[in-house]
Amino acid sequence: GTITKHFTFNGSAFVGSAVNYVTPAGVDPFAGATNTYSAGFTWRPSGRLRVDQTYFYTRLGGPQGTALAGATAYINHLSRTKVNYQFTKALSLRTIVDYNFLSANLALLSADRLKQATGDILFTYLLNPGTALYLGYNNRYENLALDPEAPAQLKRYGVPDYMTGRQLYIKLSYLFRF
């Protein structure tokens, strides 16, 4: 019917092991049990507009075969919203907004609790098949910033409202035919 025509759903699951290379001082890299899940949907309200929403969850456990095997090294949550709009056959706009939250066990992972929000905008103009002009902009905000009282150290904040990266770029892609 109409709902299935405009919506599609997807998901995946992976259970296995992965190596933690980002260990704190005195802890060797180790293999831990990992669970990775994703779920999402695509909404196409019209032929020109497409909205994708995806949620990713990843958990890495402590070193396998040790007393810490049941511990959690980290849990990572990532939510991604992607919107594509096709103005004409040649001109399109894509935006992506990511929100990333990393909760780390400092005894097993050399990383602080991280909250990060990223936004990307990309205009694409297809001059002809094989040739495209791109104009893009991206922003990154984090909950980590330089501590004004101790400039060589990072300070943790609650929400990702400190800008840590910004880019504006233009790219021309041309296909050479021989």
Language model feature labels by segment:
Residues 1-178:
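Exposed, low-structure sequence patches enriched in small/polar residues
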